[in-house]
Amino acid sequence: MARYTGPMWKISRRLGISLSGTGKELQKRPYPPGQHGPGQRRKLSEYGLQLQEKQKLRHMYGVNERQFRKTFEEAGKMPGKHGENFMILLESRLDNLVYRLGLARTRRQARQLVTHGHIIVDGSRVNIPSYRVKPGQTIAVREKSRNLQVIKEALEANNYIPDYLSFDPEKMEGTYTRLPERSELPAEINEALIVEFYSR
């Protein structure tokens, strides 16, 4: 399944969560597209709830179905809780950490920065958004890319860095200091439903 490249507000409204991180797309019309007015969302079956939760997490991180399933299966081979490990692996993606560091305003924008070669990891250019960053590795903006307006605007707008990251705004460099705990990951996701979905 190809990655969705259409307007994110449509997906946000359909799933009932903000994928932009701003929440603006839900403020004006907090109901699904095609529904005329803020009536009740139709009640979902157990399968429907599981599918919706999977789609919420998949679209949140901007991952296509093949990558999503592959990461899920990899998480199942790790010690500990399957769902929690799955979310930690998604959080460790390079494009996501570029976004978390405030170098991009959205994950989609972060993915473009990585793909276009503006990001380096431990001093080497990495242009693979799904690259898995390990604790202790540094993520920085290439020196030639530090004057990009899109990065400057993102840094000016950002006012929060998660505790599992450190960031030096002068160097435009951050470090993935440790793996995140479940309490530091998206609270609006019930990963147990996703485990149930793939266990059917």
Swiss-Prot record:
Gene3D superfamilies: Ribosomal Protein S4 Delta 41, Chain A, domain 1, RNA-binding S4 domain. It comes from the Bacteria. Keywords: Antibiotic resistance, Ribonucleoprotein, Ribosomal protein, RNA-binding, rRNA-binding. Residues 92-152 form the S4 RNA-binding domain. InterPro entries: Ribosomal_uS4, Ribosomal_uS4_bac-type, Ribosomal_uS4_CS, Ribosomal_uS4_N, S4_RNA-bd, S4_RNA-bd_sf. Belongs to the universal ribosomal protein uS4 family. Part of the 30S ribosomal subunit. Contacts protein S5. The interaction surface between S4 and S5 is involved in control of translational fidelity. This is Small ribosomal subunit protein uS4. It comes from Geobacillus stearothermophilus (Bacillus stearothermophilus). The lineage of its organism: Bacteria, Bacillati, Bacillota, Bacilli, Bacillales. The gene is rpsD.
